[in-house]
């Protein structure tokens, strides 16, 4: 464990950020899986939106976001 006050604070902040980022990524994956289970326009929009949010927050690379959305669009027909 860190001894310096600023290092302790950063460690605590990193734990909180990790929880927040993990939840956001999990929500994105859940939306994608919901679409894949039952492809519809409404679920496509929800999945696409969650991918865009993850991209804008830096959780996934912009190329991965684009690739994922293209694959979902192809499944939509």
UniProtKB/Swiss-Prot annotation:
Segments for region (Disordered): 47-77
Top-level taxon in the UniProt lineage: Bacteria
Gene Ontology cellular-component terms listed: cytosol; small ribosomal subunit
Gene Ontology molecular-function annotations: small ribosomal subunit rRNA binding; structural constituent of ribosome
Any one Gene Ontology BP term: translation
Signal sequence interval, chain numbering: none
Keywords from the UniProt entry: Ribonucleoprotein, Ribosomal protein, RNA-binding, rRNA-binding
Name of a matching Pfam family: Ribosomal_S20p
Protein family per UniProt: Belongs to the bacterial ribosomal protein bS20 family.
Function text: Binds directly to 16S ribosomal RNA.
Protein name: Small ribosomal subunit protein bS20
């Amino acid at each position: 464990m860190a001894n310096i006050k600023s290092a302790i604070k950063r460690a605590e902040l990193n734990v909180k950020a990790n929880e927040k980022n993990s939840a956001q990524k999990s929500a994105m994956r859940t939306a994608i899986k919901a679409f894949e289970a039952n492809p519809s326009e409404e679920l496509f929009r929800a999945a696409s939106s969650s991918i865009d949010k993850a991209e804008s927050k830096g959780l996934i690379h912009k190329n991965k976001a684009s690739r994922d959305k293209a694959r979902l669009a192809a499944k939509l027909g």
